[in-house]
Every structure is written in structure tokens, then in C-alpha cells.
């Protein structure tokens, strides 16, 4: 009986090791795969947004009419919408999609405010420039964490 019990324990140990080894080799992912092109796109759009705010800050406040920046607003909006679409179609990518949606919503709010007031003050520009930097850093880090 002890021989049978020892044999059973040996088989149990072997099967446990095989099972454990197979589990170590398996990875269940609940996040999208890393995409270097998405990270580069985030950085490219971040640069455009930073340049946009830099240009506004370099322009005297009396010359910051919305019509002079309308095309830039539309180009950046289109880039953010394209990034949102790219993130949305990737499986397990809700966080990145939500972050992109936040950036797009902030951008649209800024555009509407500029359109309504037909100017933007320096303090608001500096604040919003920093906000976007934080959002884009979070987006890029989030994509990088998928590696």
C-alpha cells in the first residue's frame, strides 16, 4: 500500500509540475498589445498642441481672434479623432480610448471658449498647455506600459 501511495504521490507531483509549467508559459492579456505607431502619434499630436499654444502665447492678446486659429483647431481635432478611432478599434483598449476622449473633450472646450470670447488670456493658455502636457504624458506612458 505504501508503494502505491508513493507512486500516486510521485505522479501527482509530476502532474502538478507539468501543470505549473504550462501555467507559467500562458499569459492572459486584458490590455491591448503595445503599438509603437500609436505612441509616436501621441507624441506628434502633443507637439502640435504645444506649438499651437506657444504660437498663441507669442501673439499679442489683442490679435488672438478665433478666425486666425480656426484651421489649427480643426487639424488638431481631426488628429485627436483619428487617434480616438485607432484606440477604439483595438481590443482591450478602453483606458487609452478614455484618455484620448478626455484630450478631445478638453480640446473642443478650449475651441468653443476661444470662439465665444474671440480671444484667450495668457494665464488660461499656460494652464491649458500644462493640462495637455499631463494628458499626453499619461497617454504615452499608458501605451508604453503595454510593452
Predicted regions and their residues:
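Bacterial N-terminal signal peptides that target proteins for export
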Residues: 1-17
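C-terminal motif of bacterial Sec signal peptides marking the signal peptidase cleavage site
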Residues: 21-25
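Short, solvent-exposed segments of well-ordered alpha helices
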Residues: 28-40, 63-70, 119, 123-126
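Post-signal peptide N-terminal segment of mature Sec-exported envelope proteins
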Residues: 33-57
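Alpha-helical segments in soluble extracytoplasmic regions
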Residues: 54-93
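Short, charged, amphipathic alpha-helical segments
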Residues: 66-74, 94-101, 122-130
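Heptad-repeat alpha-helical coiled-coil/4-helix-bundle sensor or tether segments in soluble regions
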Residues: 87-115
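C-terminal amphipathic alpha-helix
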Residues: 106-147
Amino acid at each position: 500500500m505504501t508503494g502505491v501511495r508513493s507512486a500516486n504521490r510521485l505522479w501527482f507531483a509530476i502532474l502538478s509540475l507539468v501543470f505549473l509549467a504550462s501555467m507559467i508559459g500562458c499569459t492572459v492579456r486584458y490590455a491591448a498589445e503595445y503599438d509603437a505607431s500609436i505612441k509616436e502619434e501621441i507624441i506628434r499630436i502633443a507637439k502640435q498642441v504645444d506649438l499651437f499654444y506657444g504660437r498663441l502665447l507669442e501673439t499679442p492678446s489683442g490679435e488672438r481672434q478665433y478666425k486666425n486659429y480656426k484651421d489649427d483647431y480643426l487639424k488638431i481635432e481631426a488628429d485627436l479623432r483619428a487617434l480616438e478611432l485607432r484606440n477604439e478599434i483595438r481590443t482591450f483598449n478602453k483606458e487609452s480610448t478614455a484618455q484620448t476622449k478626455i484630450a478631445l473633450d478638453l480640446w473642443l472646450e478650449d475651441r468653443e471658449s476661444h470662439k465665444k470670447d474671440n480671444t484667450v488670456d495668457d494665464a488660461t493658455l499656460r494652464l491649458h498647455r500644462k493640462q495637455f502636457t499631463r494628458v499626453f504624458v499619461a497617454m504615452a506612458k499608458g501605451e508604453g506600459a503595454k510593452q
